[in-house]
Curated annotation (Swiss-Prot):
Component of the ERMES/MDM complex, which serves as a molecular tether to connect the endoplasmic reticulum (ER) and mitochondria. Components of this complex are involved in the control of mitochondrial shape and protein biogenesis, and function in nonvesicular lipid trafficking between the ER and mitochondria. The mdm12-mmm1 subcomplex functions in the major beta-barrel assembly pathway that is responsible for biogenesis of all outer membrane beta-barrel proteins, and acts in a late step after the SAM complex. Homodimer. Component of the ER-mitochondria encounter structure (ERMES) or MDM complex, composed of mmm1, mdm10, mdm12 and mdm34. A mmm1 homodimer associates with one molecule of mdm12 on each side in a pairwise head-to-tail manner, and the SMP-LTD domains of mmm1 and mdm12 generate a continuous hydrophobic tunnel for phospholipid trafficking. PROSITE patterns: SMP (PS51847). The keyword Transport applies. The chain crosses the membrane at residues 23-43. One of its GO terms (molecular function) is lipid binding. Residues 65-78, 85-98, 399-408, 437-449, 466-476 have a biased composition (Polar residues). This is Maintenance of mitochondrial morphology protein 1. It comes from Aspergillus niger (strain ATCC MYA-4892 / CBS 513.88 / FGSC A1513). It comes from the Eukaryota.
């Protein structure tokens, strides 16, 4: 029994397996944490910043993915696997992304398409979108017109670029002027003082066989009231029977635009669209034709110089996008026509002459810019080029190259600042020694002329004194009483 008591019970040895498991588990957890940190915090994609411009939009304006969107990885694999060629570098544009419904949906504009009527005409349904006021557009148009008026006055002494020479050449075109009318002299031109006001702009969709899904068209109301927009001419009617110039009847006319209002339609004509069928214009007179050829050559040389400065090859025959504009037939054009016929026995303000002139002016206007006829104007090239890069004057921070370009611009614009003191109402005059005088009431209008390319008018300012004589004076006439 003592032997059993003295016998010690062996203590089982502590296994070191639990320590190894804990060590490995700790290391594995640390590795997992580091891997998760690297994956989600370092290589993870940052969330897109919230857009401040679209924060006020409703949730219904969220953009939806296009049905033409492909997998990003698939696109990358294909772009890396396939070697692009010159013909497939530019991806084709889906036709559904350029139609009117897609454009209206992506720009959040609700427009009702037009429905064709029984007679084949398009019945216009106004958009449910709120019409635009176009106040900003009126300011830009007013600045553009004011710049044209100032430029026309600065170029009044140019022998080839003045509006007076261009008008005289267009009015005396031998292919259009009848043989019984003598040489037409422009005696007074006024470009006006007011500006057109555009309002109530809305977008509609019209059917167009040349484009998929129709074509979008902007309609805006325009109103112009200016009593200083006028032109005055003098000429003579020739009686060529029984012999040439057997009798001469002096005639003086003054046409003024009292008011113009209508609905302007503007739409974009893509470059792929075939050009609209327009009647071929008659050839211009030699002087105007020479000027137009010189201007076209100068513009082509300027564009070529810009492209060479940018290191780009010159464009040859590249298509251009165009803007087509016209007026609806329900326009309003009020004219004021003053006439003076005769030398000794003078007839003043003959109603029949006023009716003939107004009818001809309306016909001239409708043949050019009234539906279904439109005017197509090519959009300018807006690609940034070094040849037409400038620096705004008055900037404090400028480099040496900017200072050099600024000095060059200031030299070019030095003459333009001389015309800042001129009033907005500018008036052309030709033949100051012999011209009929008209009163200053309702000086506004256009005349039935082919103006051609009128880039620069010659203008002479005239202060509106209001003391002009109500009596017409014809060149070479006596001071007798006027017969009405």
């Amino acid at each position: 029994m003592s032997f059993q008591q003295s016998e010690t019970v062996p203590v089982p040895a502590q296994s070191s397996l639990s320590f190894t498991q804990g060590f490995l588990l700790g290391q594995l957890s640390v590795v997992l944490l580091i891997g998760a940190f690297i994956k989600f915090f370092i290589f993870g994609e940052a969330p897109p910043p919230p857009s401040r411009g679209l924060s006020h939009r409703a949730s219904t304006h969220r953009r939806s993915n296009s049905i033409y969107t492909i997998n990003h990885n698939e696109a990358n694999n294909r772009s890396l696997r396939e070697k692009p060629s010159n013909s497939n570098v530019l991806r084709p544009v889906p036709s559904s992304s350029t139609n009117t419904r897609s454009i209206l949906r992506k720009t959040y504009y609700s427009a009702i398409p037009t429905n064709p009527s029984k007679h084949g005409r398009h019945k216009i349904h106004h958009s449910s979108h709120q019409p635009e006021s176009l106040d900003w557009f009126n300011v830009l148009i007013a600045q553009t017109i004011a710049q044209y008026r100032q430029t026309a006055y600065l170029l009044k002494d140019s022998p080839t670029s003045s509006i007076l020479s261009s008008l005289n050449a267009a009015l005396n075109n031998p292919e259009k002027k009848p043989s019984f009318i003598d040489k037409i002299n422009v005696t007074d031109i006024s470009l006006g003082e007011e500006f057109p006001i555009f309002s109530n702009c809305r977008i509609i969709a019209v059917d167009d066989p040349n484009s998929d899904g129709g074509r979008l068209q902007a309609l805006m109301d325009v109103d112009l009231s200016d009593d200083n927009l006028s032109i005055a001419i003098e000429t003579s009617l020739l009686l060529n029977y029984p012999k040439p110039c057997s009798a001469i009847l002096p005639v003086a006319l003054s046409v003024s635009v009292v008011r113009f209002s209508g609905t302007l339609c503007i739409s974009l004509v893509p470059a792929s669209t075939p050009p609209l069928h327009t009647p071929s214009p008659s050839p211009s007179p030699p002087t105007a034709d020479g000027n137009s050829r010189g201007k076209t050559t100068g513009d082509a040389n300027a564009r070529a110089a810009d492209e060479e400065a940018d290191g780009l090859p010159p464009k040859t025959g590249s298509p251009k996008s165009n803007v087509a504009f016209s007026f609806l037939p329900d326009y309003r054009l009020d004219l004021s026509v003053r006439s003076l016929i005769g030398s000794r026995s003078r007839l003043q303000d003959v109603p029949k002459v006023a009716q003939l002139v107004e009818a001809r002016v309306h016909a001239w206007f409708e043949e050019r810019v009234v539906e279904p006829r439109v005017q197509v104007v090519g959009l300018p090239d807006l690609w940034p080029r070094m040849g037409r890069t400038g620096v705004r004057t008055g900037d404090d921070s400028e480099t040496g190259s900017n200072a050099a370009s600024r000095s060059a611009m200031s030299a070019d614009l030095g003459d333009h600042h001389l015309g800042d003191r001129e009033p907005e109402g500018l008036r052309f005059r030709g033949g100051l020694a012999s011209r009929p005088q008209f009163d200053s009431v309702s000086r506004t209008s256009s005349y039935n002329v082919e103006t051609g390319d009128l880039r620069s008018p010659s203008l002479i300012r005239e202060e509106s004194s209001g003391a002009l004589s109500e009596q017409f004076q014809m060149p070479g006439s006596l001071s007798g009483a006027a017969a009405r």
